[in-house]
Amino acid sequence: MWWAYALLSALFAALTAIFAKIGIKGVDTDLATAIRTVVILVLAWGIAFFRGGLFTIHTLTKQNIVFLCLSGIATGLSWIFYFKALQIGKVSQVAPVDKMSVAIAILLAFIFLGEPLTVKTIVGALMIIGGSLVLIL
């Protein structure tokens, strides 16, 4: 079932690129990121409330909170740079570069989480990087 969620994530990420490119025309990208963040904030808290997630907030550990905050900072910085790149570049070039994050995540998961680097993951990461380079050059 994870693949269905991943596929939906990919679909919405693709829509994000298109909607963002149209929405940031003539707009300060920092303001655009702030607006996007407010929408996500309301949506995420609404989902957490209606699905009962808020009732488990007391189970969060200090480590959970620290790393969720670090993840939020990384996400925010990613969005800021992504919107700026979309404002001045083509979606067909910006999106593939952004998706190189998959290859970077594989490497970081190996370094920090001890996830194995198999021939399959190395070849897949190199194909992602190669495909991205083909699309942008």
Where are these regions (language model features)?
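Helix-helix packing/entry segments at the starts of transmembrane helices
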Residues: 31-38, 86-105
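Structural signal for membrane-spanning alpha-helices in multi-pass inner-membrane proteins
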Residues: 20, 44-51, 82, 109, ...
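Hydrophobic/small/kink-forming positions within alpha-helical transmembrane segments
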Residues: 10, 14, 18, 45, ...
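Juxtamembrane helix-loop-helix junctions in multi-pass membrane proteins
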Residues: 15-39, 57
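Hydrophobic transmembrane alpha-helices of multi-pass small-molecule transport proteins
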Residues: 120-136
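Membrane-interface interhelical linkers
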Residues: 1-11, 27, 41-67, 79-88, ...
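Hydrophobic/aromatic residues within transmembrane alpha-helices
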Residues: 23, 32, 85, 111-113
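C-terminal transmembrane-helix exit sites in multi-pass transporters
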Residues: 103-122
